[in-house]
From Swiss-Prot:
One Pfam family this sequence matches: Porphobil_deam
Assigned keywords, A-Z: Porphyrin biosynthesis, Transferase
Function: Tetrapolymerization of the monopyrrole PBG into the hydroxymethylbilane pre-uroporphyrinogen in several discrete steps.
Stored PANTHER family: PORPHOBILINOGEN DEAMINASE
Catalytic activity: 4 porphobilinogen + H2O = hydroxymethylbilane + 4 NH4(+)
Protein's name according to its UniProt entry: Porphobilinogen deaminase
Length: 298
């Protein structure tokens, strides 16, 4: 077995935090092996004008193409991606080797002026996400939504120094980068469904690398994988891209799932709630999508 395993990751603070979480889990499971992180610059990192980091769903391959190429070329053994950055189909000869434990999928408010309901009339709230913006406006139509780009630290700095009363971010990014203390309020996932697969990591490897596949089994969470399959299918049904305003929130109790989905159409929040057996898998996504499509037609 190869003794030195190289993990490929983007070089952002969040990406490296995620890669280190994976590295630490693997190192704990395989203390006799050495795990090393290699930083890789992606198209998304180069294109500063269109910095999509921490937005809902990136352009397909925007943050993954170069990392996948290094995996194909044998320069790295494992790739760590945010699931939301992954296209529906992996590059040829690459597979998902593991989906580890999920971080909190909810969105959060980071505020100078209190909770969502106590923010002043006409408060200026920053987000780069159309889904988040439209969800906010359904609850607080008085809000002025201001465009906000940049990585997590850049966004927090803009909140401090620019004309924002609050910003909305993913809980997962703040928690993974040690910034959970910045969170003012966790937004109710049933009212503000997050992006599909938010807070989920996608651990990729070569399809023919049996040793790495075996190693990655040690951090795979099959229960999370089943939920992600449903959420990703819902996204796929609506052709989920970076400008598709939709979200979903999964709550599992035993073998049952409560799947809350939302699609924002012409400023209106169209919702569906499906409560059924988790074993139905992708069928849950189709049930929710059908309910939403019927409401759109009406």
């Amino acid at each position: 077995m190869k003794k030195n395993i190289i993990i490929g990751s983007r070089g952002s603070i969040l990406a490296l935090a995620q890669a280190n979480l994976v590295k630490d889990r693997l190192q704990g499971n395989y203390p006799n092996l050495s795990f090393e992180i290699k930083e890789i610059v992606t198209s998304g990192d180069k294109d500063l004008k269109s910095n999509w980091e921490n937005s809902d769903i990136s352009l397909k391959s925007f943050f993954t193409k170069e990392i996948e190429q290094e995996l194909l070329d044998g320069e790295i053994d494992i790739a760590v991606h945010s699931m939301k950055d992954m296209p529906a189909v992996s590059a040829k000869s690459l597979i998902c080797g593991a989906i580890p434990d999920r971080e909190d999928p909810r969105d959060v408010l980071v505020s100078k002026n209190g909770l969502l309901v106590t923010l002043p009339q006409g408060a200026k709230v920053g987000t780069s996400s159309l889904r988040r913006a439209m969800n906010l406006k359904t609850v607080r139509p008085d809000f002025e939504i201001k465009h906000l780009r940049g990585n997590i630290h850049t966004r927090l700095k803009k909140l401090e120094t620019e004309d924002y009363d609050a910003i909305v971010l993913a809980a997962a990014g703040l928690k993974r980068t040690g910034l959970a203390d910045k969170i003012t309020e966790y937004l109710n996932g049933e009212v503000f469904p997050p992006a599909p697969a938010q807070g989920v990591l996608y651990i990729q490897c070569r399809e023919n690398d049996e040793e790495i596949k075996e190693i990655l089994k040690s951090i795979h969470n099959e229960a999370i994988a089943k939920i992600v399959e449903i959420e990703r299918e819902f996204s796929k049904i609506f052709d989920g891209g970076c400008h598709t305003p939709m979200g979903c929130y999964s709550q599992v109790n035993g073998d049952k799932i409560k799947f809350t989905a939302v699609y924002l159409d012409e400023g209106k929040q169209i919702r569906a709630v499906v409560e059924d057996d988790l074993a139905k898998g992708k069928e849950i996504a189709y049930m929710a999508a059908e309910e939403i499509k019927n409401k759109i037609v009406k």
